[in-house]
Regions:
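Solvent-exposed beta-strand/loop surfaces, strongest in extracytoplasmic domains of secreted
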Residues: 1-290
Length: 290
Protein backbone atom coordinates (compact mmCIF):
# COMPACT_ATOMS: atom_id res chain seq x y z
CA UNK A 1 0.00 0.00 0.00
CA UNK A 2 0.99 3.64 -0.53
CA UNK A 3 0.66 6.18 2.26
CA UNK A 4 0.42 9.62 0.70
CA UNK A 5 0.78 13.04 2.22
CA UNK A 6 0.07 16.19 0.20
CA UNK A 7 0.98 19.67 1.37
CA UNK A 8 -0.33 22.83 -0.26
CA UNK A 9 -0.09 25.98 1.79
CA UNK A 10 -2.58 28.78 1.25
CA UNK A 11 -1.45 31.27 -1.35
CA UNK A 12 -2.48 34.58 -2.81
CA UNK A 13 -4.42 34.92 -6.04
CA UNK A 14 -2.04 35.19 -8.97
CA UNK A 15 0.90 33.59 -7.16
CA UNK A 16 2.39 30.27 -8.18
CA UNK A 17 1.95 27.70 -5.38
CA UNK A 18 4.05 24.58 -4.88
CA UNK A 19 2.49 21.17 -4.22
CA UNK A 20 4.53 18.87 -2.00
CA UNK A 21 3.57 15.22 -2.40
CA UNK A 22 5.21 12.69 -0.11
CA UNK A 23 5.00 8.88 -0.23
CA UNK A 24 4.38 8.39 -3.94
CA UNK A 25 6.45 5.67 -5.68
CA UNK A 26 9.16 7.12 -7.87
CA UNK A 27 7.79 5.45 -10.99
CA UNK A 28 4.18 6.40 -10.41
CA UNK A 29 2.06 8.81 -12.40
CA UNK A 30 0.40 11.53 -10.35
CA UNK A 31 -2.74 13.37 -11.37
CA UNK A 32 -4.07 16.40 -9.46
CA UNK A 33 -7.70 17.34 -9.24
CA UNK A 34 -9.58 20.10 -7.45
CA UNK A 35 -13.06 21.14 -6.49
CA UNK A 36 -14.65 24.01 -4.60
CA UNK A 37 -14.81 23.23 -0.90
CA UNK A 38 -17.96 21.37 0.16
CA UNK A 39 -19.01 20.73 -3.44
CA UNK A 40 -19.90 17.19 -4.49
CA UNK A 41 -17.01 14.90 -5.41
CA UNK A 42 -18.46 14.65 -8.89
CA UNK A 43 -17.23 18.21 -9.48
CA UNK A 44 -13.54 17.30 -9.24
CA UNK A 45 -11.64 18.50 -12.31
CA UNK A 46 -8.08 17.90 -13.42
CA UNK A 47 -5.58 20.67 -12.74
CA UNK A 48 -1.83 21.16 -12.96
CA UNK A 49 0.38 22.88 -10.45
CA UNK A 50 0.67 25.78 -12.90
CA UNK A 51 -3.10 25.85 -13.25
CA UNK A 52 -3.55 26.55 -9.55
CA UNK A 53 -2.22 30.06 -10.21
CA UNK A 54 -5.34 30.83 -12.23
CA UNK A 55 -7.84 29.82 -9.57
CA UNK A 56 -10.05 32.57 -8.22
CA UNK A 57 -9.86 33.47 -4.56
CA UNK A 58 -11.76 31.02 -2.40
CA UNK A 59 -11.53 27.69 -0.57
CA UNK A 60 -10.90 24.45 -2.41
CA UNK A 61 -10.03 20.78 -1.98
CA UNK A 62 -7.02 19.32 -3.77
CA UNK A 63 -6.87 15.60 -4.56
CA UNK A 64 -3.63 13.88 -5.51
CA UNK A 65 -4.25 10.59 -7.35
CA UNK A 66 -1.36 8.15 -7.71
CA UNK A 67 -2.01 5.53 -10.34
CA UNK A 68 -1.24 1.86 -9.76
CA UNK A 69 2.26 0.62 -10.61
CA UNK A 70 3.79 -2.80 -10.98
CA UNK A 71 4.54 -2.96 -7.29
CA UNK A 72 2.06 -0.58 -5.69
CA UNK A 73 -1.66 -0.17 -5.69
CA UNK A 74 -3.15 3.15 -6.62
CA UNK A 75 -3.95 5.66 -3.91
CA UNK A 76 -5.28 9.18 -3.40
CA UNK A 77 -5.14 11.85 -0.75
CA UNK A 78 -6.95 15.16 -0.31
CA UNK A 79 -6.12 18.44 1.34
CA UNK A 80 -8.05 21.65 1.72
CA UNK A 81 -6.41 24.88 0.64
CA UNK A 82 -7.27 28.53 0.36
CA UNK A 83 -6.56 31.08 -2.34
CA UNK A 84 -6.40 34.47 -0.63
CA UNK A 85 -7.46 37.69 -2.27
CA UNK A 86 -4.58 39.76 -3.60
CA UNK A 87 -3.84 43.36 -2.77
CA UNK A 88 -3.61 45.60 -5.83
CA UNK A 89 -2.59 48.72 -3.90
CA UNK A 90 0.01 49.69 -1.33
CA UNK A 91 1.14 52.79 0.56
CA UNK A 92 2.77 54.15 -2.60
CA UNK A 93 -0.33 53.87 -4.80
CA UNK A 94 -1.14 57.22 -6.36
CA UNK A 95 -4.14 59.03 -7.75
CA UNK A 96 -3.42 60.98 -10.92
CA UNK A 97 -5.03 64.42 -10.98
CA UNK A 98 -4.20 67.68 -12.73
CA UNK A 99 -4.62 70.90 -10.78
CA UNK A 100 -6.28 74.00 -12.18
CA UNK A 101 -6.69 77.73 -11.74
CA UNK A 102 -9.58 79.06 -9.66
CA UNK A 103 -12.66 79.30 -11.84
CA UNK A 104 -11.36 77.06 -14.63
CA UNK A 105 -12.32 73.59 -13.34
CA UNK A 106 -13.01 71.10 -16.13
CA UNK A 107 -14.92 68.01 -15.05
CA UNK A 108 -13.14 65.83 -17.61
CA UNK A 109 -9.66 67.32 -17.73
CA UNK A 110 -9.38 67.62 -13.95
CA UNK A 111 -11.07 64.36 -13.02
CA UNK A 112 -8.97 62.05 -10.80
CA UNK A 113 -7.97 58.61 -12.04
CA UNK A 114 -5.89 55.61 -11.06
CA UNK A 115 -3.79 53.18 -13.07
CA UNK A 116 -5.66 50.12 -14.30
CA UNK A 117 -3.41 47.76 -12.34
CA UNK A 118 -4.73 49.29 -9.11
CA UNK A 119 -8.24 48.27 -10.10
CA UNK A 120 -7.78 45.08 -12.15
CA UNK A 121 -11.39 43.96 -11.86
CA UNK A 122 -12.79 47.36 -12.82
CA UNK A 123 -14.65 48.17 -9.63
CA UNK A 124 -16.45 51.51 -9.25
CA UNK A 125 -13.95 53.81 -7.56
CA UNK A 126 -15.07 56.48 -5.10
CA UNK A 127 -12.98 59.66 -4.87
CA UNK A 128 -13.08 61.86 -1.78
CA UNK A 129 -11.31 65.21 -1.37
CA UNK A 130 -9.45 66.37 1.75
CA UNK A 131 -7.61 69.41 3.04
CA UNK A 132 -4.81 67.47 4.77
CA UNK A 133 -2.23 64.95 3.64
CA UNK A 134 -3.42 62.37 6.15
CA UNK A 135 -6.86 62.52 4.49
CA UNK A 136 -8.76 63.02 7.73
CA UNK A 137 -10.47 66.38 7.11
CA UNK A 138 -12.86 66.37 4.18
CA UNK A 139 -13.45 69.42 2.04
CA UNK A 140 -16.53 71.47 2.91
CA UNK A 141 -18.43 74.55 1.81
CA UNK A 142 -15.57 76.60 3.26
CA UNK A 143 -13.44 75.24 0.42
CA UNK A 144 -16.19 75.77 -2.13
CA UNK A 145 -17.24 72.11 -2.18
CA UNK A 146 -20.94 71.48 -2.72
CA UNK A 147 -20.88 68.44 -0.42
CA UNK A 148 -18.58 67.10 2.28
CA UNK A 149 -15.60 65.54 0.54
CA UNK A 150 -16.63 67.03 -2.80
CA UNK A 151 -14.54 68.81 -5.41
CA UNK A 152 -13.16 72.05 -3.90
CA UNK A 153 -13.38 75.35 -5.75
CA UNK A 154 -11.32 77.74 -3.65
CA UNK A 155 -7.59 78.23 -4.20
CA UNK A 156 -5.33 76.02 -2.10
CA UNK A 157 -3.56 72.67 -1.86
CA UNK A 158 -5.80 69.64 -1.60
CA UNK A 159 -5.65 65.86 -1.47
CA UNK A 160 -7.82 63.20 -3.07
CA UNK A 161 -8.27 59.61 -1.94
CA UNK A 162 -9.47 56.77 -4.13
CA UNK A 163 -11.38 53.98 -2.43
CA UNK A 164 -11.42 50.79 -4.48
CA UNK A 165 -14.02 48.26 -3.31
CA UNK A 166 -13.24 44.63 -2.63
CA UNK A 167 -13.75 42.37 -5.64
CA UNK A 168 -13.80 38.65 -6.32
CA UNK A 169 -10.03 38.31 -6.26
CA UNK A 170 -8.73 41.54 -4.73
CA UNK A 171 -8.93 43.17 -1.34
CA UNK A 172 -10.29 46.68 -1.02
CA UNK A 173 -7.59 49.28 -1.55
CA UNK A 174 -6.83 52.98 -1.48
CA UNK A 175 -4.64 55.43 -3.35
CA UNK A 176 -3.98 59.12 -2.75
CA UNK A 177 -2.91 62.15 -4.73
CA UNK A 178 -2.37 65.87 -4.25
CA UNK A 179 -3.08 68.89 -6.43
CA UNK A 180 -3.28 72.67 -6.30
CA UNK A 181 -5.96 75.13 -7.25
CA UNK A 182 -3.99 78.24 -8.13
CA UNK A 183 -5.38 81.73 -7.53
CA UNK A 184 -6.86 83.49 -10.55
CA UNK A 185 -4.59 86.34 -11.73
CA UNK A 186 -6.59 89.51 -11.19
CA UNK A 187 -6.90 92.19 -13.86
CA UNK A 188 -7.69 95.68 -12.62
CA UNK A 189 -9.68 98.54 -14.07
CA UNK A 190 -8.99 101.95 -12.54
CA UNK A 191 -11.34 104.90 -12.20
CA UNK A 192 -10.78 107.91 -14.43
CA UNK A 193 -7.52 109.74 -13.90
CA UNK A 194 -8.71 112.76 -15.89
CA UNK A 195 -8.51 114.89 -12.78
CA UNK A 196 -7.89 118.59 -12.44
CA UNK A 197 -6.77 120.49 -9.37
CA UNK A 198 -9.77 121.76 -7.40
CA UNK A 199 -8.25 122.44 -4.02
CA UNK A 200 -9.73 119.26 -2.54
CA UNK A 201 -8.48 115.71 -2.02
CA UNK A 202 -9.13 113.51 -5.04
CA UNK A 203 -8.59 109.78 -5.41
CA UNK A 204 -8.50 106.91 -7.85
CA UNK A 205 -9.87 103.44 -7.14
CA UNK A 206 -9.58 100.05 -8.81
CA UNK A 207 -11.90 97.12 -9.38
CA UNK A 208 -11.31 93.57 -10.59
CA UNK A 209 -12.60 93.33 -14.14
CA UNK A 210 -12.20 89.55 -14.53
CA UNK A 211 -14.00 88.64 -11.30
CA UNK A 212 -16.26 85.61 -11.34
CA UNK A 213 -19.93 86.20 -10.67
CA UNK A 214 -20.67 86.52 -6.98
CA UNK A 215 -17.08 87.15 -5.86
CA UNK A 216 -16.48 90.11 -3.57
CA UNK A 217 -13.36 92.18 -2.92
CA UNK A 218 -12.08 94.64 -0.35
CA UNK A 219 -9.16 96.41 -1.96
CA UNK A 220 -6.40 97.95 0.16
CA UNK A 221 -4.01 100.58 -1.16
CA UNK A 222 -0.44 101.36 -0.20
CA UNK A 223 0.13 104.82 1.23
CA UNK A 224 3.67 106.16 1.57
CA UNK A 225 6.05 108.54 -0.19
CA UNK A 226 6.10 106.35 -3.28
CA UNK A 227 2.48 105.32 -3.60
CA UNK A 228 -0.91 106.84 -2.88
CA UNK A 229 -4.34 106.73 -4.41
CA UNK A 230 -5.31 110.08 -2.85
CA UNK A 231 -3.87 113.47 -3.77
CA UNK A 232 -4.63 117.17 -3.64
CA UNK A 233 -1.93 119.09 -5.46
CA UNK A 234 -1.45 119.07 -9.20
CA UNK A 235 1.25 116.49 -9.89
CA UNK A 236 1.85 112.92 -11.01
CA UNK A 237 1.15 110.05 -8.61
CA UNK A 238 1.38 106.28 -8.44
CA UNK A 239 -1.28 104.15 -6.79
CA UNK A 240 -0.72 100.56 -5.70
CA UNK A 241 -3.16 97.87 -4.63
CA UNK A 242 -1.59 95.68 -1.94
CA UNK A 243 -4.51 93.41 -1.07
CA UNK A 244 -7.61 92.27 -2.91
CA UNK A 245 -9.39 90.88 0.12
CA UNK A 246 -10.04 87.63 -1.74
CA UNK A 247 -7.60 84.71 -1.48
CA UNK A 248 -8.91 83.17 -4.70
CA UNK A 249 -7.19 85.90 -6.72
CA UNK A 250 -3.55 86.85 -7.10
CA UNK A 251 -2.12 90.20 -8.12
CA UNK A 252 1.10 90.75 -10.03
CA UNK A 253 3.39 93.68 -9.29
CA UNK A 254 2.81 95.05 -12.76
CA UNK A 255 -0.96 94.86 -12.47
CA UNK A 256 -1.03 96.37 -8.98
CA UNK A 257 0.61 99.72 -9.86
CA UNK A 258 -1.20 102.55 -11.66
CA UNK A 259 0.14 105.94 -12.71
CA UNK A 260 -2.26 108.85 -12.37
CA UNK A 261 -2.18 112.64 -12.38
CA UNK A 262 -3.96 115.70 -11.07
CA UNK A 263 -3.53 118.31 -13.75
CA UNK A 264 -3.10 122.00 -13.13
CA UNK A 265 -6.32 123.96 -13.14
CA UNK A 266 -6.75 126.52 -15.93
CA UNK A 267 -6.81 130.17 -14.86
CA UNK A 268 -9.43 132.56 -16.29
CA UNK A 269 -8.31 136.15 -15.68
CA UNK A 270 -10.32 139.32 -15.85
CA UNK A 271 -8.67 142.72 -15.56
CA UNK A 272 -10.63 145.92 -14.98
CA UNK A 273 -9.10 149.37 -15.43
CA UNK A 274 -11.57 152.21 -15.70
CA UNK A 275 -10.61 155.30 -17.60
CA UNK A 276 -9.07 157.99 -15.50
CA UNK A 277 -7.88 161.58 -15.75
CA UNK A 278 -4.30 162.51 -16.20
CA UNK A 279 -2.67 162.86 -12.86
CA UNK A 280 -5.17 160.66 -11.05
CA UNK A 281 -4.21 157.35 -9.48
CA UNK A 282 -6.02 154.55 -11.29
CA UNK A 283 -6.97 151.26 -9.70
CA UNK A 284 -6.34 147.96 -11.50
CA UNK A 285 -8.72 145.16 -10.59
CA UNK A 286 -7.47 141.65 -11.43
CA UNK A 287 -9.93 138.83 -10.99
CA UNK A 288 -9.36 135.05 -11.25
CA UNK A 289 -5.69 134.94 -10.27
CA UNK A 290 -4.75 132.19 -7.78
Amino acid sequence: PVTLTVVLDEFTYGEQPVIKLQGAPSDSKVVYQYKVKDKDDSTYADITEEGLKKLSAGEYTLKAVVEETANYVGASVTRGFKVKKAGATDSHSKVDIEGWTYGSYDGKKNAPSIASDLNPENQTVQYTYYTDGACTTQTSTENGAETAGGVPKNAGTYYVKAQIPESANYEAGTATGTFEIKPRPAQLDWSSSDLTYNGKDQRVTAEVRNALSGDGFTLAYETNEAYTNTGKNAQKYKAKVIDLGNANYSLSEEESVYSWEIKKAPVTLTVVLDEFTYGEQPVIKLQGAP
